[in-house]
């Protein structure tokens, strides 16, 4: 929920938490903190370090439940890094656990669909992403509300790559409303980048609302 300019702070403090977790030599706790720290590193664009921490989180996980919590984050980081081989391997393993591990706000078919779309684009397989973009699973109650916003922005990005400006504008309009309701400045920043110069109305609206949230956070 932090704007991008504050993400480095989150990465710093989760690193401090890792030092504490490792002291207790508890595999589950260490895996949890590693995945939180790795995810913050990814959001701060420290992608190589993120993949390293998230690989450790998956390796440290004491059971399939803990591993299923780490793997989606590792897939996101591997995709962002452009490592297609690691991304594909982790996605296969993650999807292989869907029938045997309870679903969570991150580990579920809806969230994994978004992760796959984004990873395919990041690893140079835009055409495959275009073929999958309309096949999003129906979100269930286990899906966290912010994941709907995350997915809408990713879908809009793929729609623009397919030159579907009407569909992308519709996706971003919904994402903007939800991002404001849920107070998600980072997603508004993603929206402005996605809209760019091709969707000036959505870019302007998201920018204005982002400025408003920043002022409220600074008050």
Region roles according to the model:
Residues 1-219:
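Conserved binding/catalytic microenvironments
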